[in-house]
Amino acid sequence: MPSAIVAAEQYREIFLNQHPMMDVRAPIEFTRGAFPNSTNLPLMLDSEREKVGTCYKQFGQQAAIALGHSLVNGPIKQQRIEAWASYVKANPNAYLYCFRGGLRSQLTQQWLKEAGIEVPYIQGGYKAMRQYLIGVIEAAPTQQPLLSLSGMTGCGKTDFLLQRKEAVDLEGIANHRGSSFGKNIDPQPTQINFENQLAIALLRHQQDNHSCLLLEDESFLIGRSALPQSFYSAMQAAEILVLEEPDDTRLKRLRNEYVHKMYSGFCERLGLEAGFAAFSEYLLQSLMSIRKRLGGKQHQELQDLMQQALNQQISQNDTSLHLVWIHLLLHKYYDPMYQYQLQKKSERVLFKGSHQAMHEWLNNFKSTQ
């Protein structure tokens, strides 16, 4: 028979082993932030939780508990128990948790036990596990050397990182490619979920005992996902590797990312007509987001070129004109901005080179650690 309570010392194992977890908090709590491999099967729905909370403030704990039992009773109670039982049947090693590992966890566990099902609940609940993950992020930069991978837009930093076992892909976790055109079709995670997933990725990285932690040289915001301040500060002090690629390679890579992949993704999701409309809006809105920094005249020039490229794409199935506005965007906006930023931190640059040269340098760095 499993232990009735999962101790805080097991948090690391829970996250590393992707342990299935039953989150019995209300849906509104789950939506704000949750853990990977958790499923929301609430003891109380949002409206029920709100009523119990109001009762607690006005009349105290015992009255609130009594109200909770009256709200979740009879057929409603039976439906909740059946949903939990079904989850446990599919996930026999599941744990459960509420916000603090208190009454909701204990009551859920008790009702399941009365139905003949033993499920341990996690000590401290969501709040304690969340604090644990925040601690992981804060400690990570002190665990091993931190290296920051930089390079001009389109040089393939993400492609490179995905080939390196010592790397953590921040943009993948944020579901955003970092630039003004970096939005993906699916939405970004909530800020809390971004931080939780980052912490778990760092836990896995530490488990594998790598020679360094390799990250892309990101801004504080990746789309709308904010890097935790202490982690970002450590990144700002890290030594830098600069990835270099020919302009032609960068252009074609960006056309593939901004145009081919996004167009295909929108069409798969929405169909050809609606997909092209959504794809066009994505490009034009991305350009609009940097209008102030471009200036009105330069923005208008790029917008006209972009519209011409879209017209040719839809009429002739030809994406070659997209290279024109991408080239202009690189050389009038992204490249000067990057060069200015790199110059300010040039004293931290350890190495510059191509993909192959960078792999060789990192392999050698690994062997010397």
From Swiss-Prot:
Protein source organism: Shewanella sp. (strain W3-18-1)
The Rhodanese domain, residue ranges: 15-138
Protein name stated in the entry: tRNA 2-selenouridine synthase
UniProt key word Transferase: yes
Role noted for this protein: Involved in the post-transcriptional modification of the uridine at the wobble position (U34) of tRNA(Lys), tRNA(Glu) and tRNA(Gln). Catalyzes the conversion of 2-thiouridine (S2U-RNA) to 2-selenouridine (Se2U-RNA). Acts in a two-step process involving geranylation of 2-thiouridine (S2U) to S-geranyl-2-thiouridine (geS2U) and subsequent selenation of the latter derivative to 2-selenouridine (Se2U) in the tRNA chain.
Family named by the database record: Belongs to the SelU family.
Subunit structure: Monomer.
SUPFAM superfamilies per record: Rhodanese/Cell cycle control phosphatase (SSF52821)
GO molecular function terms noted in the UniProt entry: transferase activity, transferring alkyl or aryl (other than methyl) groups; tRNA 2-selenouridine synthase activity
GO biological process, one term: tRNA wobble uridine modification
InterPro entries in alphabetical order: Rhodanese-like_dom (IPR001763), Rhodanese-like_dom_sf (IPR036873), SelU (IPR017582)
Gene name linked to the record: selU
